[in-house]
Curated annotation (Swiss-Prot):
UniProt keyword annotation of Nuclease present: yes
Alphabetized SUPFAM superfamilies for the sequence: Ribonuclease H-like
Database matches in Gene3D superfamilies: Ribonuclease H-like superfamily/Ribonuclease H
Enzyme type, top EC level: hydrolase
Positions of a divalent metal cation binding: 78-79, 170
GO MF annotation list: manganese ion binding; RNA binding; RNA-DNA hybrid ribonuclease activity
Enzyme Commission identifier(s): 3.1.26.4
Superkingdom in the source lineage: Bacteria
Entry keywords, A to Z: Cytoplasm, Endonuclease, Hydrolase, Manganese, Metal-binding, Nuclease
Protein's UniProt keywords contain Manganese: yes
Protein name per the record: Ribonuclease HII
Needed cofactors: Mn(2+); Mg(2+)
Alphabetical GO biological process terms: DNA replication, removal of RNA primer; mismatch repair
Amino acid sequence: MQTMTIKEAENVLKEIMNEEDDRFQLLMKDDRKGVQKLVLKWYKQKELEQKEKEKFFEMSKYENALREKGITYIAGIDEVGRGPLAGPVVTAAVVLPEDFYIPGLNDSKKLSEAKRERFYDEIKVQAIAIGVGIVSPQVIDDINIYQATKQAMLDAVANLSCTPQHLLIDAMKLPTPIPQTSIIKGDAKSVSISAASIIAKVTRDRMMKELGEKYPEYGFEQHMGYGTKQHLEAIEVHGVLDEHRKSFAPIKDMIQK
């Protein structure tokens, strides 16, 4: 075993699933520092995987409870973009299969952009159905952001390719006959809502990046329409766009000056 290089040991550890593996027992006895570091790394990785598995199982409790009642089509719903000064509010409704599993799934705001993009692609492949609802700044100004968010959520449900039997919604109640459960901080407590938050976030971010290309002086691709110092300074210099929400302060005050 001493003849195995560090690189070979690293590759072998990638194949090993549990401590009972004979190869693992041999590597445990290898006293080279490089090998022992790899063994420690393996333990940490397995610990992380176990925590992610437990977290995922905990986040599946709402879905599992409904499935035990014979409910199959469960739509998780979430929104992104209630707070920004520019751009639409975007919602997603996602129906997942019973065998859906993506370790590390969480509230989209807690994930790196790279992870969100990867999870977005995986959810697209695994989901039974995905619906997206987008409400423009003009409609937000007309009916207010709360009503616009509800409208976007209803649109997302309507855009599903199947009719959901139950809705799991992040902190909202919708005017629909479909049975629903409102969950505070649902994007961190339900896999379906978490998946919806990722679809909504990536969809909106891509739209704001396109807006950034159209209006490079505003830096939309950096702040996604939120009221950062950079964004407010750009509005002061270059003015208010159609994409801005005129009913939101401080834009409302700028227009009234």
